[in-house]
């Protein structure tokens, strides 16, 4: 088992890691939040993986393989977990925190494909094809991230029927999420985009550990949607008035997930 700080793993990449732009659009900037307290020691790797539904379905010898070859990293907001156009050396999961998958151009302007909250795993498509990663993976908030090496992933795919079944469902659900994200970004107004971005983070098929509450600030949500914190606040206030969610400090409680997922769909 290996436990490291996120910045210590720069040697995995052919060029130094750099903090990623945290906003997709110039108007998304906001005053920095208070820094979080220093993280405590991480639990054993077996405890972290034991909370993953796919891991619990594996045979004991396959679980042992994962634990022997995988590792965990503690990452801070702004850390680049994986670079675009670097080899897809790992299948990546979020034990705790929030990541975003995005592309940035040379001027720093970007496009976010998806947010990945606690319990989410991603990158299986590129890992299966052993291709270069197609997007940057950036921590939006302090995150505990799990890494399964590409060779371990393929060994499981070749020998574990439960794992193969999980990956098939994962690919299917991820494709649906990306199609919906493109549709929403091009055809919905801002309020509906905020609602749909939130609803995606509560998708139990992809993110089973989210639960009814999500620890996220309005600034962090703005990084996912690509609009300013002030505009996010307006949209959230409207959704709260409709009874779809309840707001607290750096937390969103979903009261009616169906209503949240339906919001703005009449625009299509």
Name what the model sees in each region.
Residues 1-14:
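Positively charged, low-complexity/disordered segments
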Residues 18-77, 126-127:
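Cyclic nucleotide-binding regulatory module and flanking cytosolic helices
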Residues 54, 79-141:
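Cyclic nucleotide-binding regulatory domains
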Residues 62, 68, 113-176:
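Cyclic-nucleotide recognition modules
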Residues 91, 115, 147, 215, ...:
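Short aromatic/basic micro-patch
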Residues 140, 158-226:
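Polybasic "coupling" helices that flank or enter modular domains
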Residues 201-268:
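Phosphate-/nucleic-acid-contacting segments
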């Amino acid at each position: 088992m290996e436990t490291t700080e996120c910045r210590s793993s720069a040697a995995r990449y052919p060029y130094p890691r750099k903090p990623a732009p945290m906003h997709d659009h110039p108007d998304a900037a906001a005053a920095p939040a208070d820094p979080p307290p220093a993280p405590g020691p991480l639990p054993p790797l077996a405890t972290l993986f034991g909370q993953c539904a796919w891991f619990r379905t594996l045979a004991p010898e396959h679980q042992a393989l994962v634990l022997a070859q995988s590792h965990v990293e503690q990452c801070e907001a702004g850390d680049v977990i994986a670079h675009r156009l670097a080899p897809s050396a790992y299948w990546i999961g979020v034990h705790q925190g929030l990541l975003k998958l995005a592309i940035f151009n040379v001027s720093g302007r970007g496009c976010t494909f998806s947010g990945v909250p606690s319990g989410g795993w991603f990158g299986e498509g590129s890992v299966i094809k052993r291709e270069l990663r197609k997007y940057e993976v950036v921590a939006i908030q302090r995150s505990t991230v799990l890494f399964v090496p590409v060779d371990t992933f393929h060994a499981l795919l070749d020998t574990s029927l439960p794992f193969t079944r999980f990956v098939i469902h994962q690919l299917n659900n991820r494709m649906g999420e990306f199609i919906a994200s493109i549709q929403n970004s091009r055809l919905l107004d801002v309020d509906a985009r905020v609602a749909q971005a939130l609803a995606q983070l509560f998708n139990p098929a992809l993110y089973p550990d989210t639960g009814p509450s999500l620890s996220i600030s309005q600034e962090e949500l703005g990084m996912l949607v690509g609009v300013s914190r002030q505009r996010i606040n307006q949209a959230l206030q409207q959704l709260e008035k409709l009874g779809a969610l309840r707001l607290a400090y750096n937390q969103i409680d979903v009261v009616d997930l169906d209503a949240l997922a339906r919001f703005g769909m009449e625009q299509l």
